[in-house]
């Protein structure tokens, strides 16, 4: 497959990578100046994470803000679905990061209260848990807002 710009010239792999670099900072939905296809920043991020260079795409396979076409795996990956999966993973990690220390601190507090030992360690653990939970929740809200 070949990749065409708006002048119908076939571009080499290195040229494709340079064109991707030129789109940095563009808002989602803006047209790529060199090949007149819509590229979102999230799509570019996926391209950089998953592949060193974009696979060759034909003119008919131009991808838009919600679809990223990977000719290497011959699959259509929905960017919105990838965002949802990322948020779900962050939610799961956030729950684990909050619940595990919280349960551990409760067990420690019970232990210190039963044994009559100093509860300072348990309270410190609880405070750390609250701070960690706050960081996770702020990170989660930032991700959800994007």
UniProtKB/Swiss-Prot annotation:
Membrane topology reported for the UniProt record: Multi-pass membrane protein
Give the record's GO CC terms. plasma membrane
Which keywords has UniProt assigned to this entry? Cell membrane, Membrane, Transmembrane, Transmembrane helix
Ranges that cross the membrane = 89-111, 121-143
Where in or outside the cell it occurs: the entry states: Cell membrane
**The name this protein goes by in its record:** Uncharacterized protein AF_1577
Origin organism is: Archaeoglobus fulgidus (strain ATCC 49558 / DSM 4304 / JCM 9628 / NBRC 100126 / VC-16)
Organism ancestry: Archaea, Methanobacteriati, Methanobacteriota, Archaeoglobi, Archaeoglobales
């Amino acid at each position: 497959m070949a990749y065409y710009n708006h002048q119908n010239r076939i571009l080499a792999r290195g040229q494709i990578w340079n064109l991707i670099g030129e789109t940095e900072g563009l808002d989602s939905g803006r047209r790529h100046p060199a090949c007149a296809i819509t590229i979102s920043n999230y799509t570019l991020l996926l391209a950089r994470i998953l592949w060193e260079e974009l696979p060759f795409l034909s003119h008919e396979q131009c991808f838009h803000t919600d679809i990223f076409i990977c000719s290497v795996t011959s699959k259509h990956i929905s960017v919105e679905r990838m965002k949802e999966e990322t948020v779900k993973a962050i939610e799961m990690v956030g729950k684990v990061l909050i619940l595990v220390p919280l349960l551990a601190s409760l067990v420690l507090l019970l232990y210190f209260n039963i044994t009559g030992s100093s509860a300072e360690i348990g309270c410190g653990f609880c405070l750390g848990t609250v701070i960690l939970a706050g960081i996770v929740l702020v990170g989660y809200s930032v991700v959800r807002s994007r």
